[in-house]
Amino acid sequence: MKAIIVFTAALAAAYATWAAQPLLTPAQLQPMLRNPDLRVIDIRDPQSFEMGHIEGAVNAPYGQWLGPAGNIGIVPELAALTRLVQSAGLTPSTHAVVVSSGVDAGDFGATARVYWTLKSLGLTELSILNGGMMDWDSEGEMTDMGPGTPVAPSQFAPRFNPEWLATRDEVKESLRKNSALLVDARPDVFYLGKFRAPMALVAGTLPGAKQLDFNQWFVPGTARFADVEKTRQVATQFQSTQNPQGKPIITFCNTGYWSATDWFAFSEILGRKDVRMYAGSAVDWTQSKEPPPMDNQPSRAESLAYDARQWWNRKFK
């Protein structure tokens, strides 16, 4: 009997250690589904969820984790997030595994943003299914169909921890003091001011920002996050060329989506403690009453020409 108790305790300890891994492969996740403290959070749309999902998964579409229509990157009200995590049956001791479609590297940003939100709400056992449902299906793992099995709501009353959040005022203060490095996770067309998000009022990047395109963290052509060695190589190259002083990092993008991937790489994979995300990102920055000039900001004539092209495309294409 004593041997059985010792073995059981050792198994529980091993699971606790394993559960903390930020990335899980389908093969790693599958045997963990039997654990009652694990909850798969599928953030795809309801139709995709019903066509096939992981056994026991709860559908909490990504749109439910977003802020107001004017800038979806803003962190939602705590009351809304509380209702969401309670309806998913989450508690502080739940091991939550966030799952998306896995169609491309951009899709990973949604899982990273939900992971960031759950961490900020107090969950400590968090993972992302690397490669999403695309890898789950391609490896032949079983799926259930239909709306899923209802779960009992929890009474979890979270508090939002701002440790990993940077606000607009905090970004302005960091610029004034030159105390942090702003890291733009967007591709070239946004960083160089050739294109802007629909809700952004100005194209370009935040003053002094350095670019670290979120795509660099992935196995090319997939939504699969690269291994730790490749992640460390990307981060080391960036640090040596763009952040030799080793300043704290504030990541941003358009609406706190791609920037969640950069945050995840530095904070969760590499273990840096001085990384925050500007959730409102470029849209919030450009919507302020008196935003400082952007870097790579197009001229007024270029902006007017861009607006005209966008209007034409919406009207006639």
Enumerate the predicted regions with their spans.
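Positively charged n-region of N-terminal signal peptides that target proteins for export
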Residues: 1-5
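N-terminal signal peptide c-region/cleavage motif recognized by signal peptidases
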Residues: 13-16
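Active-site neighborhoods of enzymes that stabilize oxyanions during catalysis
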Residues: 20, 66-68, 134-207, 290-317
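Positively charged, proline/Ser/Thr-rich regional signature most characteristic
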Residues: 20-22, 26-93, 101, 174-245, ...
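Short active-site oxyanion
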Residues: 34-40, 124-125, 248-249, 273
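Phosphate-coordinating loops and pocket residues in cytosolic domains that bind phosphorylated ligands
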Residues: 51, 138, 287
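Thiolate-centered catalytic microenvironments shared by cysteine-dependent enzyme domains
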Residues: 79-170, 195, 204, 258-275, ...
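C-terminal soluble interaction/assembly domains
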Residues: 235-238, 244-298
